[in-house]
């Protein structure tokens, strides 16, 4: 359930992009009331603009719902909201999808930078802070895991740019949801297999 909630803006972005050409013209015309959103009914190049506007609204809703339920903000949601508002807003203002295409890369690289900073400047790397209640590992292994996450975020950001510039917009939209999710799941599963060797029998 939490995974779905975290992916909520991305899922709506994908759905809005795919369904844009099926929207009735009068609904598309009515969307012009949204600031910087000027759409032409049936124009395929406008699908990314519509999807970007939906993603901005979904991110605002995500942060609001999380705060309403937990009475606090989650850092990942705030970072995503800030970037989608800035880069998504630039996409709508300049009618240029380049800005929103950079968002996944910037998000990944910011997280990678945070993991790197935690390893260089704090006593415990971020991955240890997040997982130490579930498993006990030597410091060297925590550092190795943290380094693996840094590499993962770097590679994910580069992969997003490669798909964004080497393939069509439609391919990138699919990759943004399914490709990035697939990469993350593969990495997490690989990490789980790696960690099994450090589990004590009592922890199984």
From Swiss-Prot:
Keywords attached to this entry: Cell inner membrane, Cell membrane, Membrane, Transmembrane, Transmembrane helix
Entry annotated with the keyword tRNA processing: no
Transmembrane segments: 48-68, 73-93, 102-122, 147-167, 170-190
Bilayer topology: Multi-pass membrane protein
Compartmental location: Cell inner membrane
Any one Gene Ontology cellular component term annotated for this protein: plasma membrane
Superkingdom classification of source: Bacteria
UniProt main location, coarse: membrane
Pfam families according to UniProt: IspA
PANTHER family: INNER MEMBRANE-SPANNING PROTEIN YCIB, INTRACELLULAR SEPTATION PROTEIN A-RELATED
The family this protein is said to belong to: Belongs to the YciB family.
HAMAP family: YciB (MF_00189)
Role, per record: Plays a role in cell envelope biogenesis, maintenance of cell envelope integrity and membrane homeostasis.
Protein name as catalogued: Inner membrane-spanning protein YciB
